[in-house]
Amino acid sequence: MSNQGEYPEDNRVGKHEPHDLSLTRRDLIKVSAATAAAAVVYPHSTLAASVPAATPAPEIMPLTLKVNGKTEQLEVDTRTTLLDALRENLHLIGTKKGCDHGQCGACTVLVNGRRLNACLTLAVMHQGAEITTIEGLGSPDNLHPMQAAFIKHDGFQCGYCTSGQICSSVAVLKEIQDGIPSHVTVDLVSPPERTADEIRERMSGNICRCGAYANILAAIEDAAGEIKS
């Protein structure tokens, strides 16, 4: 009769089966030989060559712009947008960075008289161009008629989009005056008329998150009578 508390032979503490992953001396020699062979097939120089090269330094270009009537000489990274050149290099921060994807119009400026989203174009593409920002339209003592109309009709709330709205509004009236049609122009032979629908369509690329659209339209219609060709 077995003593109480005595375990069977195969279940005694410390009794284990050999580990399946045990490494013998023969296996160790095989692994060492394989490692040495790999070093011959893939020498250090080949492995080093596969490491990506360091990022090259940015290309810098001289750039001449005529901004708000003043000639500016810059040296910019060729990847710099016109928006960043105006804000970071020339410190003209009236032009706002909104979406930075050309979808809100907050960065609208006038380039050679035409409106442009400054975040969508590279500065070096405008060598020698004449650029007008909100700072160049008027001054606190001598407001542009469009600036005065926006104030008169409360064409803004938070004001973040206002510089782009005003620059775009000035260009819209010039487009209509020059006979450039829009998507809602009915008669493509005759010059387009300055209707509310025409203005709304042409201003649709400028987003006002505060929703001051009715007042913006009123401001544009008011200023149109004062802006001369």
UniProtKB/Swiss-Prot annotation:
Cofactor(s) the protein needs: [2Fe-2S] cluster
Cell compartments where the protein resides: Periplasm
InterPro entries found in the cross-reference section: 2Fe-2S-bd, 2Fe-2S-bd_dom_sf, 2Fe-2S_ferredoxin-like_sf, 2Fe-2S_ferredoxin-type, 2Fe2S_fd_BS, Aldehyde_Oxdr_Iron-Sulfur, Beta-grasp_dom_sf, TAT_signal
Enzyme class name: oxidoreductase
Ligand binding ([2Fe-2S] cluster 1): C99, C104, G105, C107, C119
Keywords linked to the UniProt accession: 2Fe-2S, Iron, Iron-sulfur, Metal-binding, Oxidoreductase, Periplasm, Signal
Residues spanning the signal sequence: 1-53
Binding partners and assembly: Heterotrimer composed of PaoA, PaoB and PaoC.
Function as written in the Swiss-Prot or TrEMBL entry: Oxidizes aldehydes to the corresponding carboxylic acids with a preference for aromatic aldehydes. It might play a role in the detoxification of aldehydes to avoid cell damage.
Protein name: Aldehyde oxidoreductase iron-sulfur-binding subunit PaoA
Biological source species: Escherichia coli O157:H7
